[in-house]
């Protein structure tokens, strides 16, 4: 059955398929497949690569919509393959669940968070960020100051996913960790996406990759504007008895503030991500949650770029990659993943492309304007 399952996935378009037992994933909460399916005995990891040429145009700030469309299509393709694999397992008499790729965090199901419905959060944030006159703007400000603490209640900034597709991919032998914490494939580097099918079928595990394709170049850390990826501090992860090393990541809000688009420039001047936002993040992680609370309360009620990003972030988190329309998929960073091609030569070229790509400024109606090239997207 395992080979039939793999053939099915590859016939549907998967570039690689791997299998791991649930026992291999004992350890951290995000590795536990029983959260998704009680009685889980195996996981099936699916992989698709991203197009390197599209990524380079994105890194060079030549094409922004192209990457957004491409990444959305690849995620949806992965999920479609996962659903077909799950249907095959169910036809064989087993239970199976295809886990949504990314943005599927456990806090969304928490009682405190669900006291305010998704639809209400979205409508309220869209209204708060809309243009309004002086009187209505003052009312919005008062509402945010009073009700923001309640609306944020229940969010766990640890961002534990329903199931970690990265850990699943490593357990199933599809790749190994790079310094960034992204999973690297020998042929594609980090420009790969994963989905996972969890099942109570007992399937034979594939071998875990013994070595990592990462050679320690640290280009991922060099292109991290937020300081989320440490240059030297490291941590260990053990999967299936094999211990791997990657950087000791900083607080998740560092990544959110840059990768979600609130700020395109923090540590490194002269170039930016695709975000025109400019925020200086606190140096110490212990200050960053207070910084976020103050930032949110100060900007949520304004008709500005930051409030627009907040609205988009709520939309993305609630609807995920699968359900949201493509025009709401606003990638601004991902540089730590996209810089990491297969060879060091390619990574160096990607790094230089980023440095030469210039900065993004805010154009009319919150559109992006690329400085140096003069292009507006």
Regions found by a protein language model. Name each.
Residues 74-336, 342, 352-357:
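Catalytic cores of enzyme domains
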Residues 1-86, 90, 99-104, 113-121:
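Non-catalytic, usually N-terminal nucleic-acid engagement modules in DNA/RNA processing proteins
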Residues 24, 49-51, 199, 204, ...:
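Short, glycine-/Ser/Thr-/acidic-enriched flexible segments
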Residues 334, 338, 345-375:
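C-terminal/domain-terminus segments
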């Amino acid at each position: 059955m395992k080979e039939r399952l793999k053939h099915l996935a590859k016939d549907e378009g998967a570039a690689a398929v791997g299998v791991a037992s649930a026992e291999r994933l004992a350890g951290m909460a995000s590795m536990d497949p029983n959260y998704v399916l009680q009685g889980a005995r195996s996981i099936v990891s699916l992989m698709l690569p991203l197009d390197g040429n599209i990524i380079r145009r994105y890194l060079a700030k030549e094409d922004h919509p192209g990457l957004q469309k491409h990444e959305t299509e690849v995620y949806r393709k992965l999920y479609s393959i996962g659903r077909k694999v799950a249907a095959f397992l169910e036809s064989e008499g087993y239970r199976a669940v295809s886990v949504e790729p990314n943005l599927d965090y456990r806090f969304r199901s928490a009682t405190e968070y669900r006291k305010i419905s998704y639809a209400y959060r979205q409508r309220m944030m869209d209204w708060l960020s809309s243009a309004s006159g002086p009187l209505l703007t003052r009312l919005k400000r008062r509402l945010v100051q009073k009700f923001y603490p309640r609306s944020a209640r229940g969010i766990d900034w640890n961002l534990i996913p329903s199931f970690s597709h990265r850990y699943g991919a490593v357990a199933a032998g599809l790749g190994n960790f790079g310094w960034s914490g992204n999973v690297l494939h020998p042929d594609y580097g980090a420009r790969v996406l994963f989905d996972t099918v969890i099942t109570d079928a007992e399937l034979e595990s594939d071998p875990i990759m013994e070595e990592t394709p990462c050679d320690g170049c640290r280009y991922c850390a060099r292109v991290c504007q937020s300081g989320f990826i440490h240059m030297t501090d490291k941590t260990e992860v053990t999967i299936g008895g094999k211990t791997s090393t990657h950087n000791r990541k900083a607080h998740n809000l560092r990544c959110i503030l840059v990768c979600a688009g609130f700020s395109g420039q923090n540590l490194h001047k002269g170039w930016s991500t695709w975000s025109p936002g400019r925020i200086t993040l606190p140096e110490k992680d212990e200050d960053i949650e207070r910084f976020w609370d103050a930032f949110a309360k100060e900007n949520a009620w304004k008709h500005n770029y930051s409030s627009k990003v907040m609205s988009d972030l709520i939309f993305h988190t609630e609807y995920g990659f699968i359900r949201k329309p493509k025009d709401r998929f606003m990638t601004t960073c991902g540089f730590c993943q996209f810089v990491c091609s297969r060879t060091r030569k390619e990574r160096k070229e990607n790094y230089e492309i980023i440095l030469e790509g210039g900065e993004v400024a805010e154009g009319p109606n919150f559109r992006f304007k690329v400085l140096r090239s003069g292009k507006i997207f």
